[in-house]
Amino acid sequence: MKSVWRTLAIALLASLLLACADQRRHTRAVYLLVDTSGTYAIELEKGQHVINYLLGTLNPGDSFAVARVKSRSFSEKDIIAKVTFSKDPLQANQQKKQFKDKTLALKQQVKGGSAYTDITGGLLQAAEFLNETGAGRKTILIFSDMQEELDKQTMRNVPMNMTGIRVVAINVTKLHTDNIDPRR
């Protein structure tokens, strides 16, 4: 009889301890949008430094994607590399090396820049990727001059659900046109 009570007490204590455990997800997901348009293509080397830094800070189980902002209609083909790192640290390090190798080719792929810059389309794609990962902390980094250039056919008045996603613009450069009309 004592052993039954002892077993019940241990089971009750174990269930109470499990109920008090931290239920948050601690994985991170980062989506980096790199502007490769004509006005910003010269900054790509700095973008590679950002990628290298992020690879050093991400942990096993985290997710990372890098996409170029170049076309007027952002799509899956603009994603250069994406990965969810393995829980095994050795395998995660190997995945980081492969990821870095994929992104090193970015500078060679960009020749002269593009005529259009669909930042809003990139944000929509990034939010979709981040929400699919199920990560606890989601961040979109925009490496751009923030000059969105769309043709008259491209419509971007769609609602964006960015709930739970941090959006940070980095290395934003001042353009000559900013002095002409600062509201842009």
Description of each model-found segment:
Residues 21-23:
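Bacterial signal peptide processing site
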Residues 1-9:
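Bacterial N-terminal signal peptides that target proteins for export
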Residues 35-43, 105-116, 178-183:
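Second-shell loop/turn segments in exported
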Residues 47-53, 125, 150-156:
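N-terminal post-signal-peptidase region of extra-cytosolic proteins
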Residues 26-137, 139-143, 172-175:
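Von Willebrand factor
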Residues 16-19:
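C-terminal motif of bacterial Sec signal peptides marking the signal peptidase cleavage site
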Residues 147-184:
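VWA/integrin I-like adhesion module and closely mimicked acidic/polar interface patches used
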